[in-house]
């Protein structure tokens, strides 16, 4: 129990300080009061990798998110995450992800290969099912939100509050999000559209593109929604080597009588060859061929 509490505390400390100061094992020894050896053994036992590797890849993964979701310059991101120079940042980033920071920002899809999200002890990450959705033209009510760390900050909770207000009036809602949706600031902007077939109450019209989607399902309390969405992006996608395609996603959120929600989440993924299906078969045999359409009771557009 003591080891587990120590590792959880170390993980929390790392997350809170990635953009506050340079972190290494010496910082953690000073923070925790435990020896280097004890921390290394305990961390490796529960997380499966050395502390130094975890810090290095988490820092690069935060940089990857900032490259894709903000307009901060490479120099600004390098300084924000306490790399000693832009050259060091570029070299380290390419070693981990196979792209330079500039290349990573410019590729037409969001690559999650090699990314590492915040690890949680004894956590089982959601497994995707690959499916195909047809193109849909959608009308609905639109709002934007911004957050410097995707699905983890105050603004994401404000978005959650708006969705909850809609859900209180209905047993189920369908929403689509486009991430990122940039404005002229450097903040992460996302556009959320709550589907509504009533044109009098709708202020936006969007298109959900046809193509492959990674389908995730979870049932939990509403408070855990943000937690699940973070893990889908920063843990499930890297584990299953999936890349995010630009475009609107689809969420079907259903309210249950036990104060929990069912969330059916369809995330657009990028795939340029059919070998992808063979790779996914390694993880599960529940794949849906692209000629099939998954509806799950989605409201008609």
Swiss-Prot record:
The keyword 4Fe-4S does not apply. Residues 26-47, 74-97 bind DNA. Transmembrane segments: none annotated. Pfam families: GyrI-like (PF06445), HTH_18 (PF12833). Residues 8-107 form the HTH araC/xylS-type domain. GO terms for molecular function: bacterial-type RNA polymerase holo enzyme binding; DNA-binding transcription factor activity; sequence-specific DNA binding. This is F1 operon positive regulatory protein. It comes from Yersinia pestis. The lineage of its organism: Bacteria, Pseudomonadati, Pseudomonadota, Gammaproteobacteria, Enterobacterales.
């Amino acid at each position: 129990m003591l080891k587990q509490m120590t590792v959880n505390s170390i993980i929390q400390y790392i997350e809170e300080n990635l953009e506050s100061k340079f972190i290494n094992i010496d910082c953690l020894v000073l923070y925790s009061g435990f020896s280097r050896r004890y921390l290394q053994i305990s961390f490796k036992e529960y997380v499966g990798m050395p502390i130094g590797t975890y810090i290095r890849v988490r820092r690069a993964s935060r940089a990857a998110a900032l490259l894709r979701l903000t307009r901060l310059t490479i120099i600004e991101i390098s300084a924000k995450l306490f790399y000693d120079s832009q050259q060091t940042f570029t070299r380290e980033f390419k070693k981990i992800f196979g792209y330079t920071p500039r290349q990573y920002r410019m590729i037409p899809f969001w690559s999650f290969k090699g990314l590492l999200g915040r690890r949680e002890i004894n956590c089982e990450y959601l497994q995707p099912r690959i499916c195909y959705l047809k193109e849909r033209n959608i009308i609905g009510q639109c709002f934007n939100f911004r957050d410097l760390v995707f699905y983890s900050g105050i603004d994401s909770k404000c978005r959650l509050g708006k969705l909850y207000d809609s859900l209180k009036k209905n047993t189920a809602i369908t929403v689509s999000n486009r991430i990122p949706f940039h404005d002229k600031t450097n903040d992460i902007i996302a556009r959320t559209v709550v589907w509504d077939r009533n044109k009098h109450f709708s202020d936006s019209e969007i298109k959900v593109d046809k193509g492959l989607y990674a389908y995730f399902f979870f049932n939990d309390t509403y408070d855990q929604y943000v937690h699940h969405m973070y893990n889908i992006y920063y843990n499930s996608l890297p584990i299953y080597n999936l890349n995010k395609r630009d475009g609107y996603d689809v969420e079907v959120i259903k309210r249950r009588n036990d104060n929990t929600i069912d969330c059916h989440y369809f995330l657009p993924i990028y795939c340029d060859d059919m070998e992808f299906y063979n790779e996914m078969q390694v993880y599960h045999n529940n794949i849906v061929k692209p000629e099939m359409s998954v509806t799950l009771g989605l409201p008609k557009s």
